[in-house]
UniProtKB/Swiss-Prot annotation:
Disulfide bonds: none annotated. GO terms for molecular function: nicotinate phosphoribosyltransferase activity. This is Nicotinate phosphoribosyltransferase. Catalyzes the synthesis of beta-nicotinate D-ribonucleotide from nicotinate and 5-phospho-D-ribose 1-phosphate at the expense of ATP. InterPro entries: N/Namide_PRibTrfase, NAPRTase_N, Nic_PRibTrfase, Nic_PRibTrfase-Fam, Nicotinate_pribotase-like_C. GO terms for biological process: NAD biosynthetic process via the salvage pathway. Keywords: Ligase, Phosphoprotein, Pyridine nucleotide biosynthesis. It comes from the Bacteria. Its EC number is 6.3.4.21. The lineage of its organism: Bacteria, Pseudomonadati, Pseudomonadota, Alphaproteobacteria, Hyphomicrobiales. Transmembrane segments: none annotated. Pathway: Cofactor biosynthesis; NAD(+) biosynthesis; nicotinate D-ribonucleotide from nicotinate: step 1/1.
């Protein structure tokens, strides 16, 4: 792949619109895996996705021009999957499995378009919502976040000259490479790029992926970004997300249906995929409640992704649960992915080395760590905690509790109801930076 002069590319403002999203494959792989299941099982469910800025001190509507944001969102709505992309999805092997996507699903996907959006400004923030069929609104999550984060980066760098930009990117590259050198010291490390949604820019994410590919070789197992996986001949990686149990819980008509929602998701997932994709995401309504109510067959799955508890604490809890079910943790897999950086990767790796198989999904601190890189302090280059979550399903509010109360989303009354139902034990409040 041809190398891009990042500083010169940023400085050149001669185009009318520089599209941030140029392909519908510029998304996380698990969105396509989940989409196929949603298309097959829940085609008549409507779901609303909404932007949530957890770093409320950052006034996005003051930093990002509304006209530019609308232009980028409008451009994304013009995109369709290309013939080349459809051939790749149909013919490539994912997780050791050929034709993971059904021909009927791919035929439907070929004509898929991002639905309309609702955007307004309020108190220095943007209220951004996507209403419509779940099969369509789910595909907005990653592009919307990538657009807003990159527009914020562009606004922060708008007044920098070419030499300042050269210094900025030179320092960011050196900072990134110093992390690569530390990761090389961890034998048998398995790490992948999970950094699409809160990246500095698409081009910077591509640079980081190529740097990891060269810098740590086989320890770099792939990327969640489907377009980059295709373009760089890497594995496309990803399993499932919180939106699945959140929607099923919102649709529940009885207490039994609410309690069983996370496990029904797993049963559906196993029917569609199985094999290497049997990774449990346990924290939508708190990991403690998930483990307490889990059927015995959940212990037979390949592994867990503890996503919102401190990694060592969350990993230990799951290991103890496996042991209580008579399973050998050394044969199981833990995938750590919450706000990781090289320090937490090293600490977690050394803590669990030899006790369990490990994988690391490296996100925002891989693709958007520009702290201290600019010639002068620029707050707009600091990554923020921005998410796009499902907030409504068929008119019913959707809730995520998380193991960290700071990450809970949903109507406060519904959050309180879910806490009464699932319990509040072992949830630990932590500062959310990204």
């Amino acid at each position: 792949m041809a190398k891009t002069d990042l500083a010169r590319r940023v400085y050149n403002h001669t185009w009318k619109l520089d599209p941030i999203i140029r392909s519908l494959l510029d998304t996380d792989f698990y969105k396509l895996l989940m989409l196929q299941m949603i298309w097959g099982l829940y085609p008549r469910v409507d779901a609303t996705f909404s932007l949530i800025n957890r770093t409320s001190s950052v006034r996005l509507a003051d930093e990002i021009d509304e006209g530019e944001l609308r232009a980028q969102l409008d451009h994304a709505r013009t995109l369709r999957f290309s013939k080349k992309e459809m051939i790749w999805l149909a013919g490539n092997t994912f997780y050791g499995r050929k034709q993971i996507f059904q021909p009927e699903f791919l035929a439907w996907l070929h004509d898929c378009q991002l639905p309309e959006y609702e955007l307004r400004r309020k108190d220095g923030q943007y209220e951004l919502h996507f209403h419509g069929p779940w099969t369509h609104t789910t595909m907005w999550e990653i592009p919307a976040l990538a657009i807003i984060n990159e527009l914020r980066s562009r606004a922060a760098m708008k007044n920098l000259g070419p030499f300042s930009l050269d210094v900025l990117y030179a320092r960011a590259k050196a900072k990134m490479w110093s992390k690569v050198e530390r990761l090389r010291q961890l034998p048998d490390l398995k790490i992948s790029d999970f950094g699409t949604r809160r990246r500095h820019s698409f081009l910077w994410q591509r640079w980081c992926v190529e740097a990891l590919k060269e810098g740590i070789g086989s320890a770099f197992t792939g990327t969640s970004n489907v377009l980059l996986a295709m373009d760089t001949d890497l594995e496309a990686l990803g399993t499932n997300a919180h939106e699945l149990p959140m929607v099923l819980a919102a649709l529940a008509k009885t207490d039994d249906e609410l309690r069983s929602a996370p496990y029904r998701v797993l049963q559906d997932w196993n029917r569609y995929y199985g094999g290497n994709l049997l990774i449990v995401l346990p924290d939508a309504f708190g990991t403690a409640a998930f483990l307490r109510n889990a059927p015995d067959w959940v212990a037979d799955w390949t592994g867990f992704r503890p996503d919102s508890a401190p990694p060592i604490e969350g990993g230990e809890r799951i290991i103890e649960w496996w042991k209580s079910k008579g399973k050998d943790p050394r044969e199981k897999l833990l995938i750590f992915s919450d706000a990781l950086d090289v320090d937490t990767i090293e600490e977690t790796y050394r803590h669990f080395e030899g006790r369990v198989r490990m994988g690391f999904g490296w996100g925002t601190n891989l693709t958007n760590d520009f702290a201290g890189c600019a010639p002068q302090s620029i707050d707009g280059l600091k990554a923020i905690s921005l998410v796009c979550k499902v907030t409504d399903a068929n008119g019913h509010p959707a809730v995520k509790l998380s193991d960290n109360p700071q990450k809970a989303t949903g109507d406060p009354k519904e959050v309180a109801r879910y806490l009464r139902f699932f319990g509040n034990e072992e949830r630990v409040e932590q500062l959310v930076r990204v």
